[in-house]
A protein has these predicted regions:
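Short, solvent-exposed mixed-charge patches
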Residues: 110-111
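Catalytic and substrate-binding regions of cell-wall glycan-acting enzymes that process beta-1,4-linked
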Residues: 53-107
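Alpha-helical segment that forms one wall of the substrate-binding/catalytic cleft
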Residues: 3-57, 61-70
């Protein structure tokens, strides 16, 4: 069953630990969960050819799993969640663009 910050299932978590040689990783540790998500997104990009920046499809692959991803169109709830994730990702992307523009301004004078 899924557990921890990443809601990772046991089998996939064990695969992550083997492939990353991170034998002491635990689903209850935030740092490990974040690393797991990065590993999963990277692997999803390679296995299913889903771009890392495609929040909609990446979410569906995470929610359904690699094996059942192809059937996501039958899962209306997953599609609703994925649209919400996509919208949130777009909001964050816009905010990051604004932040970057503000950080690039030379508004501080160093003497």
């Amino acid at each position: 069953s899924s557990f921890g910050y990443s809601q990772a299932v046991v089998g996939t978590w064990e695969q992550y630990k083997r492939e990353t040689n991170n034998k002491l990783a635990t689903r209850a540790r935030f740092k490990d969960s974040v690393d797991f998500i990065g590993w999963y997104v990277n692997k999803t990009s390679k296995l299913l050819k889903i771009p890392k920046g495609d929040a909609y499809k990446q979410y569906l692959a995470y929610y359904k799993g690699w094996g059942d991803y192809k059937n996501y169109k039958k899962d209306k709830k997953a599609i609703i969640y994925a649209k919400s994730v996509k919208d949130l990702a777009n909001t964050y992307r816009k905010q990051l663009t604004i932040c970057q523009k503000n950080l690039n301004k030379n508004k501080y004078i160093i003497f």
